Amino acid sequence: GLQVCEECFSDKRKVREHKCMKNSALASFLAYKEAMKWTRMRLEAVTDAFICPSRFMADKMVQGNFDKQKINTLCNFIDIAKTRKDDYDKENYYCYIGRLSPEKGIGTLIEAAKRLPYPLKIIGGGSLEETLRAAAAGSDIELLGYKHWPEIKEIVGKARFCVVPSEWYENNPLSVIESQCLGTPVLGSRIGGIPELIDEGKTGMLFESGNAKELKARIGQMFATPFEYRQIALGAQKRYSAERYYAKLLKIYTSL
C-alpha cells in the first residue's frame, strides 16, 4: 500500500503478512527471519553506540525500545566543494529532484503544479514517468529525466526553490541538504526527518504531506518570499561540511 505502516513495532510477522519487502513473499520471509535473528537485545549487546542521521530515526529507535543512552544523532554531510558557486542568481521556476514513484509524493506535486502559473522542472526517472508525462501535457511542467551532477547543480542552483513532497518517511534526505548548499530553499512535506532540516521562513517552508491544496498555497508563498539565497548556501555549507561531521563523530567515539 501507499500508507506508512508501523505494525512491525508490535508484531514482526506483519512484514510477511503485508509482503513489505518488494511486495515479494520470499523477500519478506527473509526479512522476517533476519529481524528475528538480529533482535534488539542482540544488537544492543554488540553495539556501543547507535548513530542516527536524524532525530526522527533516533525517536523511532526509542519507540522500538532501544537503549536511549546508546543513541546519538549525527546529520549526514556532503562534499561541499561540489556545491560552491560564483553567484546565487535565480530564474523564475521551481524544481523537483528524485525518483518518480508514488511514495515520493510526485503525484501530489503534479496535481498542485497544474493549477499554478509557475514553471516546474522535474529531474529524475522512475515507474511513474510516463504517467506523469501524460498528466503534465499542456502545462508548464517539464520532465527532464535523469541528469548528472553538473546539470543538476545548474538547474537546482538557479531554481527559486526545490520541492521535497515525500509521503513516506525520509530519514535525512540529501536532496534537501544539497539544495540548501546551492543556495536554494526547500519546500518540504512535514514527515520523517525533513522538518529538522528546514528553518521555516528562512531556509524554506513545510506543508502537510499528501495535501495538494496546502502544497499549492505554499508554492505561491515560496515565490512571494524574498529568501537570502547566499546566506542559505553559506549556512548550509558550514552545517553540512565533512569537517564538522568528523569532529562530532570523533566526539561520539571518544566518549565511549
Predicted regions and their residues:
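Donor nucleotide-sugar binding/catalytic pocket of nucleotide-sugar-dependent glycosyltransferases
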Residues: E6-T83, L143
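Short hydrophobic beta-strand element within catalytic cores of glycosyltransferases
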Residues: P185-G188
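A short, well-ordered alpha-helix in the C-terminal region of glycosyltransferases
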Residues: T203, E214, Q221, F227-A242, ...
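Nucleotide-activated donor-binding/catalytic signature segment of Leloir-type glycosyltransferases, i.e.
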Residues: E130-E154
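Conserved donor-binding/catalytic core segment of Leloir-type glycosyltransferases
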Residues: I51, D86-P117
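Nucleotide-sugar-dependent
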Residues: P165-L174, P195-E196
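Short acidic/histidine- and often glycine-rich active-site loop of Leloir-type glycosyltransferases
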Residues: V176-I177, I191-G201, M205-L206
